[in-house]
Regions:
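Alpha-helical coiled-coil scaffolding segments
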Residues: 1-137
């Protein structure tokens, strides 16, 4: 495991509830439930309607897929750039794909913070007393 991945896992744990913390950085990372709770934490509110923990598979052979579909809907609806990660990748706990999603969620959080900072700066008057325009693309 490299330093960047360790840093990413520490970051993820700041968003995850105690029962979903990643405790062994070399073992399984997190499943769909952890990824959804992480995304909800970044957004600052739960998905609507709420997704119960029981909607997620507990192992790769579990057929509960509703939670995973809701996770991917949430990520797509919020424009999280997931790349080539599939529901099956998450269901099977593929480490490289979970890390890819964690990176995507971190990038999404960074983008949200940058946008919030831009909006905040746009409301501060300049020396001439004019308001700075805010352009959101």
């Amino acid at each position: 495991m490299n330093v960047a991945d360790e840093t990413l896992i520490k970051w993820a744990n700041t968003h995850l509830p105690d029962n979903l913390q990643i405790t062994d950085p070399t073992g399984p990372l997190c499943g769909g439930l952890g990824l959804l709770r992480l995304a909800e934490s970044i957004k600052g509110r739960p998905s609507s309607p709420p997704v119960p923990d029981s909607a997620f598979p507990t192992d790769p052979n579990d057929d509960k897929l509703d939670g995973l579909f809701r996770l991917f809907d949430f990520l797509l609806d919020n424009d999280v750039k997931m790349g080539s990660v599939s529901i099956n990748d998450v269901r099977q706990g593929k480490r490289d794909k979970i890390l890819q999603l964690l990176r995507a969620l971190k990038a999404w959080e960074d983008k949200r913070r940058a946008l919030a900072n831009t909006i905040a700066r746009g409301s501060i008057p300049t020396n001439a007393g004019f308001m700075l325009p805010v352009v959101i693309s």
